[in-house]
């Protein structure tokens, strides 16, 4: 994990990834990371991946439940990757000023969907 801590009083853990192509191989996420994120979520925390698609110059906030869905599919013999077109468009972040990452807005959005 790239960050484990509290953001505005909310327990948060995330890992940042980079992808050049529109297909993200699940081998870029390790089993121990999925396990840790799951435990963190069960204890009331917010876990997610930030995936930067370099060719698109887009950043994607992937909620734990989404990465877990793709992970489980791979473990059950399905695709060991996910495609860009499988992502939920509402979780694509627009970079501000070319570098600012507005992840706090997406943490709040994630929390709002849990209530």
Can you name each region flagged by the protein language model?
Residues 15-17, 46-50, 111-115:
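Charged, low-complexity, helix/coiled-coil-prone segments
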Residues 17-43:
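Mg2+/Mn2+-dependent nuclease catalytic core
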Residues 38-68:
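Nucleic-acid nuclease catalytic cores
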Residues 13, 22-25, 58-59:
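Short acidic/glycine-rich loop or secondary-structure boundary segments that cap or lie
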Residues 3-21:
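Conserved catalytic cores of phosphodiester-cleaving nucleases, focusing on short active-site segments
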Residues 1, 60-115:
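Non-catalytic C-terminal interaction segments of nucleic acid-processing enzymes
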